[in-house]
Amino acid sequence: MARMPTMATRGNMEVKKIIETGDIFLGIEFGSTRIKAVLTDEKGEVLGIGIHDWENSFLDGIWTYPLDEILSGLSSCYASIKRDIKEKYGVTLKQIKYMGISAMMHGYMAFDKDMNLLAPFQTWRNSNTEEAAKDLSESFKFNIPLRWTIAHLYQRILDREEHVRNINFVTTLSSYIHYLLTGEKNIGIGDASGIFPIDSTAMNYDASMLDIFEEKIVEYKFPWKIREILPKVMVAGQRAGVLSKSGASLLDKDGDLQEGSILCPPEGDAGTGMVATNSIKKGTGNMSAGTSMFAMLVLDKKLNDYYEEIDMVTTPAGDPVAMSHANNGTSDLNAWVGLFREFSKLFGINISDGELFEKLYTNSLNGSPDCGNLMSFGYFSGEGITKLNEGRPLFLRSPKSEFNLANFMRAHLYSSLTAVKVGLDILTEKENVKIKKMMGHGGLFKTKGVGQRYLSAAINAPVEVLETASEGGAWGIALLALYVSQADKYSLDEFLSKKIFDKNTGSEIMADEKDVEGFKTFTQRYLNTVDIERLSVEKFAE
């Protein structure tokens, strides 16, 4: 069986000694709704977990997180794991040998020479870059998605925003936090691949595309060059900086944490998800299922063409990856579960969130394979795959639809996966990419056998979920921090296979043929009715 991610297999006294000597590895990941910290030993076994919940804000037409919430969230999450360690082992965290930062990819953070933020942080959820993304994609002959950092930067240029002239550094959330902790403007290659296209041979930004971009903006006569304002690209295993005194103070408001921890390259949540599911080998894939959804397939060759629906990114080791990404995942689903929670409280019934999700999800298995002609669009924001810049959560049924609770929940679960399926269908149908197996991780897979079965139906391939799956990227970035200490002995693939997942087995499910056909029917209905979603954006004001 897989190692349990929330409990070390050693005795408490032995763990206490390990913590006191500082031979431990910390990963912190900034997700969309939760900042999570995971502390491991040298075997990758989890010693403690810290959590800080947060939410993005929709201010002045953009999705953002204020800087003060980023900083307070960082220290709150660290305080949470510090308490967890103290309660479990009676020891105070003071030394941490290696650590790493991960965060949601893409978006736009632009700073001046004094590292003052020049414009509000725009997250990956913002799709207000249509003109820029289209122009760059045509110029590069490479798909530039709406949420990519270079699309945001170029859109600001096209809009002639005044702050652009004063830019000294443009980066992502993980790289910014890494800078706060170390003073180094570095980034992991996986996260960098969501800023600007990557050359997997050079392990750096694509030089020819940088030149094309420079030519496109020469008329503006900016005092900077694109190569000068992007973070330095680094690959897994490299030392990307050392925790400074000020960085330690940012993390630990009590002042107990010592400076000097070695940091791995900061990575994006896509890359840490690949690590956490041991899916960085060529031909393997993984699906991250949470408030956003993305499926990633590590390629053994380049694609023949480029597609708007497919992003080309990389593993933390730099290998090319095709990604089908959806901005919208389980947010609408979670909102409906919240409604059922409110209903139960109205009758004085107290049900834990875990039980509520488990009962509703499991009951959906009793629904029809095609969801009984029910349809859902859980669009809290725009969706690139269906070419929508805004979204409205929408539920549809006809008078003859099979309207019951099982089909209702099943439709929302299917819908959360369908946009990603549309992208994957392009790879399998137009590029003849074979999906041998998909590894699942994220909140959707916490209820055993439900999200896993539906994903298998969507892709018509086996889906495996490890016991570590719900820990996701925070554990993944902790493993990347651990890998820095092993990089002289193993490739990243070897390290994960031989040192971390050598005894791991997960649960694997292959959907029934009727579920596969049912999902195909649902997907076709989804595509046939997406214009109703488009009309709702036009007619139904926020």
Annotate the PLM regions:
Residues 2-120, 166, 227, 249, ...:
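N-terminal glycine/serine-rich phosphate-binding loop of ATP-dependent small-molecule kinases
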Residues 8, 12-21, 26-27, 93, ...:
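Active-site core segments that coordinate phosphate-bearing ligands/cofactors
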Residues 48-49, 222-238:
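Core alpha/beta catalytic barrel or barrel-like domain that forms the active/cofactor pocket
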Residues 63, 137-141, 229:
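Short glycine/proline- and acidic residue-enriched helix-loop micro-motifs
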Residues 86-123, 143-145, 178-190, 194-199, ...:
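Short beta-strand-loop/turn "lid" adjacent to the catalytic site in phosphate-handling enzymes
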Residues 126:
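Carbohydrate-associated surface elements
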Residues 129:
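Gly/Ser-rich phosphate-binding catalytic loop and adjacent alpha/beta segment
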